[in-house]
Amino acid sequence: MSVPDYMQCAEDHQTLLVVVQAVGIVSEENFFRIYKRICSVSQLSVRDTQRALFIRYRHHYPPENNEWGDFQTHRKVVGLITITDCFSPKDWPQTFEKFHVQKEIYGSTLYDSRLFVFGLQGDVAEQPRPDVAFYPNYDDCDSVEKRIEDFIESLFIVLESKRLDRATDKSGDKIPLLCVPFEKKDFVGLDTDSRHYKKRCQGRMRKHVGDLCLQAGMLQDALVHYHMSVELLRSVNDFLWLGAALEGLCSASVIYHYPGGTGGKTGARRLQGSSLPSEAANRHRPGAQEVLIDPGALTTNGINPDTSTEIGRAKNCLSPEDIIDKYKEAISYYSKYKNAGVIELEACVKAVRVLAIQKRGMEASEFLQNAVYINLRQLSEEEKIQRYSILSELYELIGFHRKSAFFKRVAAMQCVAPSIAEPGWRACYKLLLETLPGYSLSLDPKDFSKGTHRGWAAVQMRLLHELVYASRRMGNPALSVRHLSFLLQTMLDFLSDQEKKDVTQSLENYTAKCPGTMEPITLPDGLTLPPVPFTKLPIVRCVKLLSLPTSLRPHKVKSLLGQSMSTKSPFIYSPIIAHNRGEERNKKIDFQWVQGDVCEVQLMVYNPMPFELRVENMGLLTSGVEFESLPAALSLPAESGLYPVTLVGVPQTTGMITVNGYHTTVFGVFSDCLLDNLPGLKTGGSTVEVIPALPRLQISTSLPRSARSLQPSAGDEIATNVSVQLYNGETQQLAVTLENIGLEPLEQLEVTSKLLTTKEKLYGDFLSWKLEETLAQFPLQPGKVATFTINIKAKLDFSCQENLLQDLSDDGISVSGFPLSSPFRQVVRPRVESRPTNPSEGSKTGDLGHVKTLEAVLNFKYSGGPGHVEGYYRNLSLGLHVEVEPSVFFTRVSTLPATSTRQCHLLLDVFNSTEHELTVCARNNSELVLHASECQRMAIQVDKFNFESVPESPGEKGHFANLKQLEEERQEARGLEISSKLDIRWRIPSLKRSGEASVEGLLNQLILEHLQLAPLQWDVLVDGQPCDCEVAAACQVGDPVRLEVRLTNRSPRSVGPFALTVVPFQDHQNGVHNYDLHDVISFVGSSTFYLDTVQPSGQSTCLGALLFLYTGDFFLNIRFHEDCKSKELPPSWVCLPSVHVRALGAQA
């Protein structure tokens, strides 16, 4: 026997071997259709008994193996079933003859045979024959299973007769010597009458009867016969047959202990109509006692039925541990015979299957190791493949997965051995795939993305290389690309630099013919190879969705309740909702993208390769919103470290969009890399809302861009920065061009400004504009342009604390509180030693050369299109950087009374801080020319001011923080009124630049009082004409002059009554006043005037007359009586103007 049956198991010893073969030409499909139906009848209960027969079918069985049928009866072919096609009665004789020829091959051992004929109809088919069955076709053959059952019953009858015949021990009969084929020549010439010979014959026959009993379903009888055989054969040292007896004993015990079988069959081999005893669960108990049943208890029909019904009472079978020991002993006996190599190998296989059931892997591996070294005849390549495959399956059965994979790989390599004319690359590839689990490999790259690497990387890489080569030899380049991609993705950390270069070069060569895709590859056997995305080429460590640029970010119009209010809940705050939505906040981002705008996602990538990595067609993978990804191409330097990469795309619709990953093309392999499959990835969320489309506004100005960027508060960003240099007081126009560069109409525009500089005091409107004409052009369609003008007025403090002119003794008040000179001009150069030496003081008000900076932000809030309907808008900020150089300074300011009580002189010391000649002028005054760094004093005659009072209602007072702030507001309002009336302007002719100068901030409370018109207004009229000192009232000598004094009360309270006396005098212009004018002037009536009490906003008038007797210039001084109510009022309230009267001679 040279062909081992690697599928043998211990329970096969109880089966009857039936060969099913085709006679003539029968299609393989039809043959196996009937063969499968025949195999379905593998177990049959014997009528009127509790025994069962088990059948083992084979469609191919070497005839030489049949010669070992006496040694082990399950190897004997006892039944033959042939299948043939016969469509004509003429062919029937020839077909039947072939059937007989086939029977002759196994004729010495056959119990019975059957012939199934398909296609023959007519008289021949209608003749009843016990060994032939006729069927019209392969579809109309319902009785096949019934025929097989009848056939098995006939086999049982023959089997039972042979068992009874061999089991009957007739004294005096000579027992034949059963032999194996190679023993026949060894027994020629032996003494057949010796006691040793007879014991040999008895022992072998007893073992043979045990085999028949086991096949006939009499387990306990078989155990008894095997025990008796062992004793007999052991006494004569018949080792080969002793091994067979021990193996039979082991097989019977295995059948008893493991009713489910050891060969992995699905159904348990049990007696039909019977149940296992309750002690079956304890059959595996170690050390079960062996008690031999008295052979006298045996009958021709087997053991007494009473004992046969409860097998558990019989302790003849071996314990699980003893089974293995007996197997080892039997195999040791087999190993003594070279020609019993197949028997030894199959015994090892059977023992391994038993040990696998007992979960004793280490002992099973010893049997397998022994099987590996059993020398058989020279095996064919196909037999070698079969042997290694079975060894692999057995190692897998006992849990030695890597050992199993090793032999599976050896079998795969054997399929393409050089000695094979036509290498079986497909079989090799299939076997290599089956080895993957044993080497901790799978075809899914996800299994390698988490945790530490499992298995030996070097062996795994070798196996993957072999898969690549085998798939290439199969002519399937797509498979080669898939396996090579898997190798590069999963084994990247274990490849040397040279290996990385070699693998990528090979991959590029393969993908040049067949690019790698993300489509699963389904093999003919149904196995699916999942796609292999290159998540390590490059490695992505961080994914961050970027907000739109500041100028393009959408903002939601705040509702009346505020942004923080939720319309989904009536509660102001609910911690439960906040807790439940924690995970959602981690995924959703707090900014929005806009439909139709280019949106960005930043990836931090790393190139692990030792050479430059070219990544082509890299784009985003999204869901939820229609998204147009704009692919990018990268070139990462070798081992680049973290490298920022920005991927962009345009959402085409609105809704929630989720960034699921990215796609790349590397080395010709297209990859879809999902974020969920990236290990160690940091992301701040991947879901963002896309709102409806909004217009895009682009701003350009007439000013140059600024190199300095403004840093506004609250995280705002400036889209564009412009700068301009102005002199203090100068105004410049900024032309702003608005262009709609988007796809939606611009429907709404609001412009606001915000001053960033707070340390400098600004006077007036720094920025001003008018939008009416611009808004009249709205809606501004895409591509259209609109313009408007912004006025920039840099008006800072013009005061300076430096004393640049000599102090003169007069009654004026300076800014610093020192007396000033009279209103004639005095010119002086600035004294260097008077400059402050402390650097901190240099930045204060009054630093003559300090350039001050003003920064402001113009904010353009605009909206339009679908986004405007949904309540969204955009902000575009323009940063304005203004450097203000000093123009003129007012180093001192004071006042001098004028000849009129309603006027005064404002004295200003003006300093030119520029490097150019500068002119200064006030309203109705001539220009004052100042050279560079020159200071001059200018006097401006001004009418006194009737300042409007700041309201003092309780609500108005509450608007200010305190009374001091209230007073400051009043003072600023008065300063603004004074500046507007003075209208002081400067001009630099050489630069053609001009501006205004303001006295706001210069005037203290004392000066304001001097400039303020008294609440009591005194008017003196001479002959009905208002009179003031500057203009002399003319009259004729001898004519009475009517004098009228009028009082207007503008104070909030009533005043008076008053008594006034008119005192005339003459001024000799030498400091001498002559009051003795009784002979020159005569009063018509009294020289004292009386005024009654005047109510608020009321008026009172008193009249008198004078008579001038001589010509000349006379002055009338109107005084209050000392006991008058005037003492209760401030002096400025009771200051009456002087009257200048010129008496002329009578005209002829």
From Swiss-Prot:
Domain of life, per lineage: Eukaryota
GO biological process terms, semicolon-separated: cerebral cortex development; endoplasmic reticulum to Golgi vesicle-mediated transport; neuron differentiation; vesicle coating; vesicle tethering
Tissue expression profile of the protein: Expressed in neurons of the pyramidal layer of the cortex, in spinal cord motor neurons and white matter neurons (at protein level).
Subcellular location(s) of the protein: Golgi apparatus, cis-Golgi network; Endoplasmic reticulum; Cytoplasm
Sequence positions bearing Phosphoserine: 566, 953
Entries under InterPro entries matching the protein: TRAPP_II_complex_Trs120
Any Gene Ontology CC annotation: cytoplasm
Keyword field contains Cytoplasm: yes
UniProt keywords, alphabetically: Cytoplasm, Differentiation, Endoplasmic reticulum, Golgi apparatus, Phosphoprotein
Main localization (coarse): Golgi
Biological function: Functions as an activator of NF-kappa-B through increased phosphorylation of the IKK complex. May function in neuronal cells differentiation. May play a role in vesicular transport from endoplasmic reticulum to Golgi.
Subunit details: Component of the multisubunit TRAPP (transport protein particle) complex, which includes at least TRAPPC2, TRAPPC2L, TRAPPC3, TRAPPC3L, TRAPPC4, TRAPPC5, TRAPPC8, TRAPPC9, TRAPPC10, TRAPPC11 and TRAPPC12. Directly interacts with IKBKB and MAP3K14.
Family: Belongs to the NIBP family.
This protein's name: Trafficking protein particle complex subunit 9
